[in-house]
Amino acid sequence: MSITSYIFWLFLIVSLLVYYVFPQKLQWVVLLVTSIFFFGLSCELYTGIYLLITIFATYVCANKMILETDQLKAKKWLIIGIVIDAGILIVLKYSNFGIENVNVLFSVFGLKKQISHISWLAPLGISYYTMQVIAYLVDVYGGVVKPEKNILKTALFIGYYPQLTSGPIAKFAEMKDQLYSGHKLEIDKIAYGCQRILW
């Protein structure tokens, strides 16, 4: 769903109306639900499995890291999280690039064997959210931020729909209050937000 399409703007307006109808303490839930709907409308539903794996792996690894008193064990969880999250991105986005290079090598050595391309469909915003979760895991490991204890809030941080379309890659420390704290309806801020989307 393009941010310049009528459907996106209709979706955004409905999302805003629902967001401000709900009590402030539940507004983050509205953001999560609208992000899930947006994801479902924008790409094949089965690609959501990759996003769910990223959410679960990031949540588990971040919270395991903080429990470890041994730095090496904490680093183990950091590495596991990065390998899983980056691995999904690499396989989905770059496996065909690797296959092409292998096929070129086969040709150079006179081999007729060719490996077929794989038809992967990557989730919306995979590059953005992968870089974001890696930065989050590094910040948790470095003690810059504490890990989010609520997996649904972690899901919102990773899958927040305005960021899935065009970024930016945001730090958890910068985003958590904006996502999880309630907000009062302020027309000037909504107008400013619309300007930022367009320009």
Can you say where each PLM-predicted feature lies in the sequence?
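Membrane-embedded transmembrane alpha-helical bundles that form the catalytic cores
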Residues: M1-W199
